[in-house]
Amino acid sequence: MVLHLTSLALSHFRSHKVARLALDGRPVAIFGPNGAGKTNILEAVSLFSPGRGLRRSSAEDMARRPEALGWKLSGVLQSLSQVHEVDTWSDAGAARQVKIDGKAAAQTALGRIARVLWLIPSMDRLWIEGAEGRRRFLDRMTLSFIPDHAQVSLEYDKAMRERNRLLKDMVRDPHWYAALELRLAETGSAIHANRLQALSDLAAAQSGAQTAFPAADLTLQPGEMGMPDTVEDLRAALADGRMRDLAAGRTLIGPHRADLYGAYAAKGVPAKDCSTGEQKALLVSLILANARALAQDFGAPPLLLLDEVAAHLDADRRAALYDEICALGAQAWMTGTETALFDSLGNRAQYVEVTDTDGLSTARPL
């Protein structure tokens, strides 16, 4: 079974006025100078999954300037035994829309037909910056295993915004809180359980794997207030904590307060204390473990988006990465400034050269 794009078209997306790629399922090596528009192609592929893509941008910001006419992406997705035509677009700053096989669909529906994971340069500081980035990284992996995680997360965020609004307005009437806290407890408990399941799946995929990259021990750490085990316990904790939350002006218990702890397993060293090279290797290892797990769980490895990853690995690690990607059968989209970075891939990949002329990107398959 496979998961890959067989075609991709960009219209007025970022620096690309028009780009069309025909694809055969092999990894895609995209090369060209810095600023040419390589990452914009990876961002386009990331939008074949729910959410705001690898840059977390608004739909309006993705439109080509100065026209700002809106943008459109179209792709043909081979997903296991099915072929889907997928379109996603935004009209002049409007919210992103999705069609699957010609029918309007919610973004969350993309999670049922595609799995997309990425590593981008801003994630290099994942282990040493704030918990929000680590939660986002964990939730992206969780979403790859459990497509409904996107919807339950949206529902949780909506309920929390509403409760926080009550707290900031110093509303004390318990009737205003009861329904919101039940919804927070139901969705929050589901988020917590989903994350734990994803971590279990990742641990199993790392155990005994033949890989050149170091295994990571991952632990989900609750916030200072802990994380109750059941829906009823979380609901009660939210109710009991109202006065505390009123003083803070926000909700202080729930999965939005959690953190992801990582350690270099063989050394027993916290990821935050590892060298930058080791931290990068741990991230690559986790992405590959996620891909191995999905090959078993979903039936095919995910689409992998690796932006400037090759440049930060030595030649041996680079070759090992390519070997693992090809052994998995994953369609990995990789960027680099020169073709030499992909020498050890050889004819196992398709190559696309991206150039820029006065702010207009051109993508040329070789």
Region locations from a protein language model:
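Conserved lysine of the Walker
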Residues: K38
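Walker B catalytic acidic pair
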Residues: D307-V309
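Long, charged N-terminal accessory/stalk domains
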Residues: R125-L126, E132-A178
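Nucleotide-state sensing region of NTPase/ATPase domains
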Residues: S46-G133, D139-H149, S200, A204, ...
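H-loop/switch region of ABC-family ATPase nucleotide-binding domains
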Residues: T335-T337
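Hydrophobic "anchor" residues on beta-strands that sit immediately upstream
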Residues: R20, Q97, V116, L303-L304
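Conserved NTPase motor "head" modules and their coupling/switch loops across ABC/AAA+ ATPases, GTPases
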Residues: M1-P33, L47, H175-E186, A190-L303, ...
